[in-house]
Amino acid sequence: MKRFPFPAAFTILLIGGILAAAPLVTARLSGLRLAAIVDLLDFTPERTPLSPLIARTIEPAPLPRPVLRLQQASALLDDRNEALDGFYKALSRAERGEPGAVTRMVHYGDSPTTADLITGDIRALLQQRFGDAGHGFVLIAKPWAWYQHRGVDLSGSGWQILPATRFQAHDGWFGLGGVSFTAEDAARTRIRLQDPGQSNFELYYLKQPNGGSVAISADRQSIADVSTNGEVKQAGFFAFSVSGGASELDLRPSGSAHLFGITAEKPGPGVVYDSLGLNGASITVLSRIFGERHWAEQLRHRQPDLVIVNYGTNEADFNAFIDHGYEKELRTAIQRIRAALPQVSILIMSPMDRGRRTGGGEIETMETIPRIVDIQRRVAHDTGCAFFDTFAAMGGAGTMARWYAAQPRLVSADLIHPSPAGGKRIATVFVRELEAGLERFKVR
């Protein structure tokens, strides 16, 4: 019987003929031994236009608008009991174009979120409808080669990178995005913004005894030298604005520095969508690995209108954990978010279908996926969260078999990760359901 490690750091990827294996990691947590992990990836994120849900093949075209289907209730999005009312109110202000009305959404997830698959298309659709208020939160450097935030080119060197899904340290200081970056003098980061309209920025870092400084420049013009020195270890934030916007930021530490990420925004009105994905992540990242007080401080500072919790794929391999531990961990994660932000809207987003091959070579849905979806739906109802059924939105059981047989394929060879086209389909349905929920909210 497989025993689930806390947190689950598991990503299965098969690349047809081209395999790239990352180092095997072994660790112990709470008496459980982490099995060897192979981090492989067989998809390449692309910046291609969105395609409608009904299209199997489509040439590049402008972003489509999801077609709203107003109804009393949705089988895919359960937003009963006013679970999303706070979010809908914020979105309505942005839609009306109220000055400075910025709706912030943070999306915690696993490897597809790491590559900004699904989330990148959700961001594009929402910003097309409600206004573009900027890129949002971006990590300091790439923890994995496939990390990306659409519209941002990120390069860095000299950083010691520690994602929350590794086990070298358990101090819980992972910032908002779940990755810490430490460096001495030799490190640097350059962030190129394809849309130069970003004008409001904020550096997330750690204050600590004997901390060094970070030199910030925008478009080769010096902005500030930010001291990270502090009497005690605590979160630090440095906000700055660039008149007219910036297309390039440079960060250079001097002495010891510990950074988390940077936000890039526009004045609004509009939407900001933070994609906070960790490769191999599970719900235990939020329920155990993030330091509770530190993470609460990060959330309160970011002040999102909606927190999306999107895990389950990596847990699907661990039957015993699903039966005896998963629900408790999910409830704990929700309780942590509620304690930090009592009024925030929370949406639990189910995992996608996940396929596996039978002895005869056929592709079937892993039987643990529907069980996870059922647990998530129940917990969402019990805790006052909204719930989006990604599994059903894709087509339910057998979806990965159909998507793998599609031309072009909508899922990679690992039967886990969607192709960019598959990700766009999910994003289109998700945004359609949110927009329909907003229209229902308006007429209540």
PLM segments and residue spans:
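Conserved SGNH/GDSL esterase-like catalytic core that processes O-acyl groups on lipids
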Residues: R104, T113-K328, H417
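Sec-exported extracytoplasmic/periplasmic mature domains
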Residues: S92, T113, L117, R123-G131, ...
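Conserved N-terminal glycine/acidic-rich loop preference
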Residues: Q303-A316, H324-A339, L347-F387
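Juxtamembrane proline-rich low-complexity "stalk" or linker regions positioned immediately after a signal peptide
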Residues: R28-R69
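Hydrophobic membrane-insertion alpha-helices, especially the h-region
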Residues: P7-L24
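N-terminal low-complexity, Pro/Thr/Ser-rich intrinsically disordered segments
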Residues: P52-E95
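Alpha-helical scaffolding within the catalytic cores
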Residues: D79-E95, L286-R300, K328-R336, R371, ...
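Catalytic His-Asp segment of secreted/periplasmic serine-dependent ester chemistry enzymes
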Residues: A27-R28, G291-E292, M352-R444
